[in-house]
Design a protein with these regions (language model features):
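Extracellular/periplasmic helix-exit of transmembrane alpha-helices
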Residues: 106-124, 135-138, 171-174, 186, ...
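Re-entrant/interfacial helical elements at transmembrane boundaries that shape
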Residues: 35-36, 163-172, 202-204, 218-222, ...
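Flexible loop linkers connecting adjacent transmembrane helices
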Residues: 2-8, 209-228, 256
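Hydrophobic alpha-helical segments of multi-pass membrane transport proteins
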Residues: 100-103, 110, 202-206, 233-256
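Select transmembrane alpha-helical segments in multipass membrane proteins
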Residues: 9-25, 69-72, 134-157, 194-198, ...
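Helix-loop junctions at the membrane interface of multi-pass solute transporters
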Residues: 78-80, 154-160, 164-177, 184-188
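Membrane-interface loop-to-helix entry segments
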Residues: 16, 34-41, 64-114, 118-126, ...
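Helix-loop-helix module between adjacent transmembrane segments
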Residues: 3-35, 39-80, 234, 241-250
Length: 256
């Protein structure tokens, strides 16, 4: 910001850096990712809170799976971050493609197993978006809620409009800014157009979006359990593994 807009905008660069740290630490960079990992692990190993521990009186009780997962996560993040950008890159370039391919394969299997429902699923998506109920709801004030949810989902999906992409692009070691720009755009395309579309379609195909009482990770878990031709426990394990490693690499990138 300082080099591009001039030294008189140095204050703006400092504000950008401050809020970037806040978002990375208290927002989508760390806290929400840790919560996602804890929810996934808790839902798989101890969904009924059969074993709980009390760390401090004012913190309440937590499932043993959450405590152990948090300790392991802290150790792994520290071990990678101490190695600097090279270790982060070497770990991420192994984990991210591997887990993306696994998630893609299982999501495609789910869709193929329910291929006859795909036309109806797309019809449901379109009709629900443009139904009189949706239009009326928007007219009476639900539009603001829809926009809020949409912006939140968009930021969590690919961080569009957040301003975080330049941070990662600036840290990249490349001789071609054009190539780096293409890499940044490719990441957004893969994340939103491919991964998120597969996830949304899986949720609609299995009817997980209509099940009451499910939130967040639980919705996708239900879709994988009921849509894949594998034992429910195995499907849940695959999803948990993907979520844990995706969130782990996100923490590495933001904390660095």
């Amino acid at each position: 910001i300082e080099l591009g807009m001039g030294k008189k905008f140095k204050w703006l660069a400092k504000i950008f850096a401050f809020f970037g740290v806040c978002v990375g630490l208290f927002g989508i960079g760390t806290f929400s990712q840790v919560n996602g990992i804890s929810s996934a692990v808790h839902g798989f190993f101890d969904p009924n809170d059969a074993f709980t521990v009390k760390i401090l009186p004012f913190l309440g009780e937590y499932s043993w799976s959450v405590v152990i997962a948090s300790l392991i996560l802290s150790f792994c993040v520290a071990a990678v971050l101490i190695g600097g950008v090279k270790r982060i890159a070497s770990v991420s370039q192994i984990i991210v493609p591997f887990m993306a391919v696994i998630y893609f394969v299982f999501a495609v299997i789910l869709i193929c197993c329910n291929i006859t429902k795909v036309p109806a699923a797309f019809a449901t998506i379109v009709t629900a978006a443009f139904s009189p109920k949706a239009i009326t709801g928007g007219a009476v004030g639900s539009m603001l809620i829809a926009m809020q949810k949409g912006v939140a989902r968009g930021i969590f999906s690919n961080e569009a409009g957040l301003g975080s992409a330049p941070i990662a692009a600036a840290a990249a070691q490349t001789n071609s800014p054009v190539r780096q720009g293409l890499v940044s755009m490719t990441g957004t395309f893969i994340d939103t157009i491919i991964i998120c579309t597969l996830t949304g379609l899986s949720i609609v195909l299995t009817g997980a979006w209509q099940v009451e009482g499910l939130e967040g990770v639980q919705v996708t878990t239900y879709a994988f359990q009921h849509g894949l031709p594998f034992p429910a426990q195995f499907s849940s394990f695959i999803l948990m593994l993907c979520l844990v490693f995706f969130a782990f690499t996100t923490i590495l990138g933001w904390d660095y």
